[in-house]
Amino acid sequence: DLLFLMVGAVMLRTHADTIEELGGVGRKMPVTMFCFFVGALAAVGVPPTNGFTSKWIIYQALMAEGQPLLALISLIGSVITLAYLARFMHAVFLGQPGRNLDHIEEAPLVMRAPMLLMAGMVIVTGVFPGLLLAPLNDALAEYGMPSLDVAFYGLATGPGAWNATAVAVLMLVAFGGAGLGLRFLLT
């Protein structure tokens, strides 16, 4: 799992045993911090990651089966996940340095490469969910199980549809525009 690889990279480079010993590591390990951020977004279920697609399917299935309370409990679980991962992100990567960071370096390539590959796959399969869902659908159909209405760019389930590619493009435009606007305002 992406988050476990990231924790291993931080432990290798810092030799820290507790979160309290860390802080500000993101300045020295930006690739590791980026990979953690992508993994955290997926765990919480934020578009355009594959975590959102997974949670979308679960929420839609629960709603279709008349289980809105279970859908709400699942959503609350995602909010709790957001809280502890945000705390971890701040404590390890963004907070005040817990000690001297001069000796800390980015994770070695042998650790960075799998993290970057996994982070890339989290985003690619989130933007194009049909890459994984179409073969899964075929397997479900072989066993007579209900399948999803899947396209390369998204899916339709029960009362809703999800076009992951369109949402990813809109998010890119929105965040890119906001970043340019902020840069313009600050200069």
What are these language model-derived features?
Residues 1, 17, 102-105, 138, ...:
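Acidic-enriched, low-complexity/disordered segments with a strong bias for Aspartate over Glutamate
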Residues 1, 5, 9, 13, ...:
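Membrane-spanning helices that line or support transport/gating and their immediate boundary helices
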Residues 1-4, 65-105, 171-187:
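Predominantly late transmembrane helices and immediately cytosolic-facing juxtamembrane segments
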Residues 8-78, 88, 99-124:
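Interfacial and helix-entry/exit segments of alpha-helical transmembrane bundles
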Residues 18, 22-25, 59, 93, ...:
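Hydrophobic alpha-helical segments of integral membrane proteins
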Residues 44, 82, 92, 96, ...:
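Phosphate/oxyanion-binding loops and surfaces in catalytic or ligand/nucleic-acid-binding neighborhoods
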Residues 111-187:
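Membrane-interface and transmembrane segments of multi-pass membrane proteins
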